[in-house]
From Swiss-Prot:
One Pfam family, short name: TrmE_N
Organism for this UniProt entry: Brucella melitensis biotype 1 (strain ATCC 23456 / CCUG 17765 / NCTC 10094 / 16M)
Gene: mnmE
Protein name, entry field: tRNA modification GTPase MnmE
UniProt xrefs under HAMAP family: GTPase_MnmE
Annotated residues for binding of Mg(2+): S235, T256
NCBIfam families linked: mnmE_trmE_thdF (TIGR00450), PRK05291.1-3 (NF003661), small_GTP (TIGR00231)
GO terms assigned for molecular function: GTP binding; GTPase activity; metal ion binding
InterPro entries: G_TrmE, GTP-bd, GTP-bd_TrmE_N, GTPase_MnmE, MnmE_dom2, MnmE_helical, P-loop_NTPase, Small_GTP-bd
Alphabetical keyword list: Cytoplasm, GTP-binding, Hydrolase, Magnesium, Metal-binding, Nucleotide-binding, Potassium, tRNA processing
Length: 442
């Protein structure tokens, strides 16, 4: 974020949804907030009480009449003086209000995520809470919302702060042994106890990282790929799952040349289903590209649905891939004698078997995600720093032939890596990346 250090500026932005709307909310934060009130409203409302006022330009023209709320520092979202103006959500009204605010000295439009970045800078939240808020805003399913809310509630911060304090305490014991080994009030040797404590902490962090894999699936979604020969009914199945006509259905083989993807919400879990080009030998350059893309997507899938027309000659061939594969017999309404080959039999013409397949997909997704714990790493950034923490802990535990000073330094580095997750230690270079994920006005 450019010039983020200029906290002397007062920032403003539309923080509500797309215009036009019933109500539009403009948020303001910074040292000029009271001046904005004096200029636009000719009054400063009572803190944290809604006031109905007329908003005016500097020459006195009325812009709109609406509610406003004033949140004095430090008891506000950003920790600065903040205000909200609730206007009618017409495009002209909002544009005029933003233009008037932009003309005031010391005021400028906020950059993406700048309100939240100021909240972080003023100690109102840590980085994990900020990331949780970003995920909460982006959440599209109930499962994603619950996961984001766990993070935004501070569960991660509590856990990482506890682990960091344990490392600091362990290091203090080692340094006490180094500095006061000759003193009578220092236990003879605490090293063995410290290494046992660090070993237990290492196992806790490893378990925590493992739980993060399921959280990543919930945050990013599961991927299901539909494959099969041309005219096996792949596009018809995709249209059923999507609840609308996404793919073109034709008797002509090879109609689908590229990947078609729809997003489903199965029990609160995001599931991306991809229709692919029919797998067959072909001389068509375009169709070959589509088949190559299909195979590439299969390699990334969590589940592959391999479809074959039950009414024709049976020639079930499943390509070797790591993902779980279900054999699906299609066009069940036309008959077929090899029913024992298929995990499910479906007909998009009659609807036979489709609900059972959908239920099975939801059960698969729920089993894959499992039970998400209260505090889990939700970003690759978290996992990388947790692995770095483990690496330093292992060096400290296994460094029997090293001086205690060096092992204490490993413990200091481990606690520093944990501090970088929450933003307590040396994170300036990643702030732009994190806060750029927010929309303007948040």
């Amino acid at each position: 974020m450019s010039e983020i250090g200029s906290y002397h500026d007062t920032i403003f932005a539309l923080s509500s949804g797309r215009l036009p709307s019933g109500v539009a909310v403009i948020r303001i934060s910074g040292p000029k907030t009271r001046f904005v009130y004096e200029t636009i409203c000719q009054a400063i409302p009572e803190p944290r009480h809604a006031a109905l006022l007329t908003f005016r330009s500097r020459n006195g023209d009325a812009i709109d009449r609406g509610l406003t709320l004033f949140f004095p520092a430090p008891h506000s979202f950003t920790g600065e003086d903040c205000a909200e103006f609730h206007l009618h959500g017409g495009k002209a009204v909002v544009e005029k209000m933003l233009a008037v605010l932009g003309e005031l000295p010391g005021c400028r439009i906020a950059e993406a995520g700048e309100f939240t970045r100021r909240a972080f800078a003023n100690g109102k939240m840590d980085l994990t809470i900020a990331e949780g808020l970003a995920d909460l805003i982006a959440a599209e399913t109930e499962g994603q919302r619950r996961l984001a809310m766990q993070v935004a509630s501070g569960n991660q911060r509590k856990l990482y702060s506890e682990w960091r304090q344990r490392l600091i305490n362990a290091r203090a014991f080692i340094e006490a042994e180094l500095d006061f080994a000759d003193e009578s009030d220092v236990p003879g040797s605490v090293s063995m106890q410290v290494w046992q404590q660090l070993s237990a902490l290492k196992h806790e962090i490893e378990h925590h990282i493992a739980s993060g894999k399921r959280a990543a699936m919930l945050r990013d979604g599961l991927h299901v790929v539909i494959v099969g020969a041309p005219n096996a009914g792949k596009s018809s199945l995709l249209n059923f799952l999507a609840g609308r006509d996404v793919a073109i259905i034709s008797e002509e083989a090879g109609t689908t040349r590229d990947l078609l993807e729809v997003k489903l919400d199965l029990g609160g879990i995001p599931v991306y289903v991809t229709d692919t080009a029919g797998l067959r030998e072909t001389d068509s350059v375009v169709e070959k590209i589509g088949i190559e893309r299909a195979r590439a997507r299969m390699a990334e899938a969590d589940l592959v649905l391999s479809l074959e027309d039950m009414s024709g000659p049976v020639s079930v061939t499943v390509e070797k891939i790591e993902a779980e594969t279900w054999l699906i017999g299609t066009k069940a309404d036309l008959g077929g004698s090899a029913s024992g080959l298929w995990k499910y039999h479906i007909s998009t013409m009659t609807g036979s078997g489709l609900e059972q397949l959908l239920d099975a997909l939801q059960a698969f997704a729920e089993a894959k995600i499992g039970q998400i714990e209260d505090a889990v790493p939700t970003r690759q950034r978290h996992i990388n720093l947790l692995r770095a923490t483990i690496e330093e802990i292992e060096k400290a535990i296994e460094g029997d032939d090293l001086p205690l000073e060096l092992r204490a330094e490993n413990m200091r580095l481990a606690s520093q890596f944990l501090g970088r997750i929450t933003g307590d230690v040396d994170v300036e270079e990643i702030l732009d990346v994190i806060f750029s994920q927010f929309c303007i006005g948040k």
